[in-house]
Amino acid sequence: MTWLAGGSLASVKTATTVLLDPDKKLRAFGFEAEDEYNQLVEDSEEDGIGERTYEKYYYFRQFKMSLYNCSGVLTRNTMIEDETEKKLPAMLVISLSIGYMKNHLLTLINKRCIGVEENDIHWVITIPAIWDDSAKQLMRESAINGGIQSDHLSFALEPEAASIYCQLVKVILSEEGTSTQAGAKRKSFRSSRAGTTYMVLDLGGLII
């Protein structure tokens, strides 16, 4: 699954950014949310009470880091602050985000595959290793509110998921010979073998 950044740049990741209408309905997610909010700011006009139009919207930019930085215990009652200092329940923001990504993926699957039903999918959400039970419960309830069935949902710790990815990702073994294209090398790929050494680094919330 790829996302468009800036209208043309394709990326396998997108921003954890959400734009909600004044009535708290999801308007846009990811790079699209950033683009739409920037446009709202540019086109904004003052209303009769001196409030700019864009200030009526809820804009949570990179809200995943807000969850990392929440003071105290992260619970189902935790509130997070948007870019204009308006607060909403973290559970609402997470639920809308998960629901969007779920529906986005299902739409792509239906376009590319035949016979895949929603019940065929088991969803795995990665969470920080330092999260306690209350934070995990927040994420579980958010996922269920986002439309994922409880019996089709599992969690994996982010470092463990990164480690499994390192074991399964195919790496270039060698470049030898030439392909049918002049000057192009023929590459050999394989997954890591038993005994392969690798390192998973945590850079301030970003897992490599």
Where in this protein do the model-derived segments appear?
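Secondary-structure transition/capping motifs at alpha-helix termini
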Residues: 145-151, 174-177
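Phosphate/ATP-binding catalytic cores across multiple sugar-kinase/actin-like superfamilies
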Residues: 96-115, 166-189
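Phosphate-binding loop and its immediate beta->loop->alpha context
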Residues: 2-146
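Gly/Thr-rich phosphate-binding beta-strand-loop-beta motif of the actin/hexokinase/Hsp70
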Residues: 1-3, 56-58, 170-208
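Conserved phosphate-binding/catalytic loops in two-lobed NTP-binding clefts
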Residues: 147-161
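Short, flexible loop/turn elements at secondary-structure junctions
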Residues: 67, 129-131, 157-160, 202-207
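Extended hydrophobic secondary-structure segments that form protein cores and membrane-embedded regions
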Residues: 121-128, 155-156, 198-202
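Short acidic, glycine/serine/threonine-rich loops at helix termini
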Residues: 136-139, 165-169
